[in-house]
Amino acid sequence: MMGGRGTGGKWPSAFGLLLLWGVAASALPLESGPTGQDSVQEATEGRSGLLTFLAWWHEWASQASSSTPVGGGTPGLSKSQERPPPQQPPHLDKKPCKNFFWKTFSSCK
């Protein structure tokens, strides 16, 4: 399976990085100037917007991970994993064609 166990660790680590980025961005000193109070208010609104987004994203990621178990929970097999792989006929060793020309797509006899 292509998206097996490797994908399970990607979302929590991405969430952690995004959360760290948000904390680091909110800890930066604010520019103080003639509109220092306005910049504090804008920063507060930005932080609340960021926290709202992070809460929504965490909820979305947890719902996605709970609906499709990646490696935890009860191990269940899908229908494609329950049946055995199709039996292939044994490979017959054939001698290569001496006069095979690839542009004609002719088969050798």
UniProtKB/Swiss-Prot annotation:
Residues 1-25 form the signal peptide. Its main location: secreted. It is found in: Secreted. It comes from the Eukaryota. One of its GO terms (cellular component) is extracellular region. Residues 26-93 form a propeptide. Belongs to the somatostatin family. This is Cortistatin.
